[in-house]
Amino acid sequence: MPIGRGTVRRGSAALILAAPLLGTAPGAAGSGPVTFATPGYELRVATDRLTLTTVRAGRTVLATAAGAFRFRIGGDWYLVREVTDSSREGDTVRVTAATDLPDVTVYLRITLRSDRYDVNWSLSGATADVLSTAYDLDSAGHWYGHGENTDQTVQPWPLDSGQLVDTAFSPASYQVVSPFWYTADGTGLRVDTDEPMDVRINSGGNGLGEFTVAGDRPAASTVFVEDTPAEVYRDHIALVGKPEHSDTSYAQYATPLWNSWAQLYGEQNQRNVLAWARALAAAGLDGHAIQVEESVIAADFDERFPDLPALSQELKRLGFDLGMWTGLYMPETAADFSQAVDKGYLLKDPSDPSRPCLFTWWNGRPTGLIDLANPAARQWYTRGLKAQVRESGVAGFKFDTAFFDDRCVPYPGATRADYVRHGTELAGEFDQQRAGLRVAWNAAQAQGFATRTADKPTTFAELRAAVSANLAVSTIGYPFVETDMIGGSLQYPPPTDEVLARWAQAASLMPLMYASTSPTGVRDTTTGKWVDYDPGTVELYRAAIATHKRLAPYIWDQVRQTLKTGDPIMRPLFFDFPKDEAGYTVADEWMLGPAVLAAPKLDEGTTRDVFLPSGVWRDVSRGSVLRGPATLRAYAAPLGVTPAFVNLRAKGAAKALKALRAAGATR
């Protein structure tokens, strides 16, 4: 069924690779198309100006825009124009088209398959700097996928309801991304590249999806043609790989990981960490680990943490393992910086390979990045981590940020994708305490790491963005997902009681809980003043942890199912209920496995509308049985209520219902 589009938020963005197309996206392709049929769909190639239109059951389900195929040479953009020849031999379609340049021709090869087609196009007569393809967003209904937005505070869901501009979309991105997009009409796009791209979704409200790649090789992509978004997702996973295992244990799924960042920010020291951990334990706020957001490479680390073994022992007595932050970034102030430079262990400067590549890190300090593709550097770095485990009682690590930076050059013979592989292999040697990785791209899905979405500020708007980011990351192939961190961070004022409680409640109905701000109190980093939370907030947070812990057997079942199928655990409603049109724009509900519909309150107030898809549902808060599809208007959700519903006909319903009743999604 055709799915309508949501409201567009307008904005502007700088240009790096791609220049926006003029005007807005048109409708169908031009007149006189050449049609190539398969049993499942038709591909129509317009001849007056090269465009591709995918038709299933007589209806357009994806189309490129007019002027969709473009290329840039130097500072000038040129369009691909009329088709001059086309032919089909077996499953291969070949198309030749003219361009704005009289001596330059485009060759396009399409390989037709039963549920997809591969597109490969390039120039003859010139070498382009970049090749760009644009799709009409409206032709396929709503768009999803991509992963995280570069603006961490905004995550449009669906993508076309807002704007995304990522001029450095690559394996080295800080954001968790993959070159995969899917649509409400059951089509999808996968761009086959490991090089940086320029990606724009609805830039300036133009209604286009623009995908630009380097022009020194053909632009290669796959278009999936299925009946539902979930089937497209499974096609994608079949190519990049489903998780081979879960790096996270059952106990780590069951209780939160507490990270010290948003609690202490720049005041990371042994005394403060212990005081925080003791307050958590005294308040009955469970967790499996206390993770210190600091690295032993800091120049003053020994002053601030004089006795790591003693810290580890005391945390163990309180019920927590000790974890430490680590990353490949090495600022000039690091104790081992000079050694890393002298040994050639850092990525190299593109303008002078004899020098390390230095750039400004988040804290304003010049820094380099350890070169994991250099075997000697990798061995040196790994040896240091093993020493921490052996000598200091560190149980695991948080591997933070990226494993490569596009401002640097790869090790000779290595690609950007190799750094993803080296990074995941390195992290796999150590217990991450389910802090997960922020690394992605094709084939990283198979590693089975927990995945943290990006830091968010501390307001309700960012809680909603965190939920949408989880859905985006989960449905590009990273099912073991969590928000970073409950209550937000980014050195903003602490969250209000209401935001902190609601965030914990939402996280209780996700695969994993990742915490920092303590409901027992926190220092406001913007004022230096201590903030005491209401005792009721402690109780609500404790209840959220209890809910998640009781759901752990059900969640663990979903983990094992995901290892078989690759399906996401936290997923949008339309994955399970593709015929319910309303579900395609719901951004504040999700399915946790097949049986649990989570509808927590994600903004101020005490009521919310809840959409229930088709089926028979048990309202956990009220005990009533409801039939969908239905919209529950002004559903009562005071601060002590986390709306949740169990699909009584779904696998796992009995186990989920028992857990939610016992823990009390109403507490």
What are these regions (language model features)?
Residues 1-30:
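Secretory targeting and sorting signals
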Residues 641, 648-667:
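Accessory, solvent-exposed terminal regions and/or long lumenal/extracellular loops of proteins
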Residues 72-114:
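Extended, loop-rich substrate-binding clefts of extracytoplasmic carbohydrate-active enzymes
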Residues 29-32, 37-38, 45-48, 83-92, ...:
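Short, ordered beta-strand-loop transition motifs
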Residues 30-66, 101-104, 112-118, 605:
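Beta-strand-rich N-terminal accessory domains
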Residues 34-38, 71, 95, 180:
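Short acidic-hydrophobic surface loop/beta-edge motif
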Residues 23-31, 660-667:
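N-terminal low-complexity, Pro/Thr-rich disordered segments
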Residues 43, 100-101, 113-119, 124-647, ...:
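Catalytic-domain carbohydrate-binding cleft regions of carbohydrate-active enzymes
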